Amino acid sequence: MANKPAPPKARLFTPKDVRLGLTQAEDVAHPLRWGIMGTGEICRQFVCAAKEVPGATIAGVASRSAENAYQFAQTHGVAKAFDRYEDLIADPDLDIVYVGTPDVVHKAHTLLALEAGKHVLCEKALATTVADAQEMHAAAKQQSVMLQDGVWSRFFPAVEHARHLIEEGAIGDVVMVQADFDALYTGQVVTMAYGADAKPVDIKVSGKQGGPGGAIIEFADNRFAVLTFIAFPSEFPEVFEITGTKGRITLEQPGHCPTALTVRIPPVTPSRYLGGNTPSPMQCFEYPLPDSIRMPQPFPNQQGFYYMVEAIHRCLAAGLRECPQFGRAESIHLMELVCAIKDLRGQNPALE
């Protein structure tokens, strides 16, 4: 980008749970024994990052295939392998379960773990319907355990920083969100910008299942979100922008797992509109990924699972049953938004 200033020296932005005084930073070392439900690519990515968190032990893995479970355990140094999910859940040496199975069985597998008194981190999408998501969160509340929706984007330092700027009013009142990727990832930046209480007054969509498309979402007080959905494989910007009455925040590519953001606050004067092309002053911030974590390909920035696992350790150490970065109310609100978009596009309710 032309005339882009050099970023300041890299640093981490204080996570919301610590910033609010709900947790202590050192509680990342709070010991938790993790069980992994599933052995697919997302589970491999997750384990590579999670095992680097100081308090985390990957204690068990389960698959419908005994061979897959055994190979996964051998590759990742996991002590126990099971060929039945029920046996993993019944293990008394586990505190928390990561559900990395396909979306269509998230509800069944999550409820299985919750009913056994285990904390759960369920991979996104949490469920395939709003009713299922509500039932899952209600079960966690009933059991007094954590069910964390795995929208990992919210735990990246760049996103933590962006949200703090929005909440403190640095860019004024948010009036526009623009994002391109899929319905879930673009939807979560909408709920972050406008809040879990903001309900759309109108949604217009275009495109069909399996192809490109988009959505224009209108909220009260003339506020909007413009989302573009791109079919894979494709090259696309994947930049998320949040515009307010005083300025704009850009979560740089890849917007769903960013390591940088740019903040533009224009002068409080009409001079920039009068015959000039002077760009708004910019502040650029970079938050490099943990360099000690070695990840398999092909997905970008999967080291960022680390941030979500850290937050879970801190929050459970403090006795919390949800992470403030992405709590129950917002999890359900996001499901409502995504399902509404997908229903209007005539898609299968299962979230790809």
Question: Can you describe what each PLM-predicted range is?
Answer:
Residues 82, 122, 147-149, 178, ...:
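Hydrophobic residues in well-ordered beta-strands that form the structural core
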Residues 1-28, 96, 220, 307-352:
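C-terminal helix-rich "cap/oligomerization" subdomain common to oxidoreductases
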Residues 127-189:
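A contiguous active-site-proximal alpha/beta segment in oxidoreductase catalytic domains
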Residues 60, 80, 95-96, 176, ...:
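Short, Asp-centered acidic motifs that coordinate Mg2+ and/or phosphate
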Residues 223-310, 320-329:
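NAD(P)-dinucleotide binding in Rossmann-like oxidoreductases
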Residues 186-243, 254-255, 332:
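Rossmann-like dinucleotide-binding domain that binds NAD(P)(H)
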Residues 67, 76-139:
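Beta-loop-alpha module in the N-terminal Rossmann-like domain of NAD(P)-dependent dehydrogenases
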Residues 2-76, 347:
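N-terminal Rossmann-like dinucleotide-binding module
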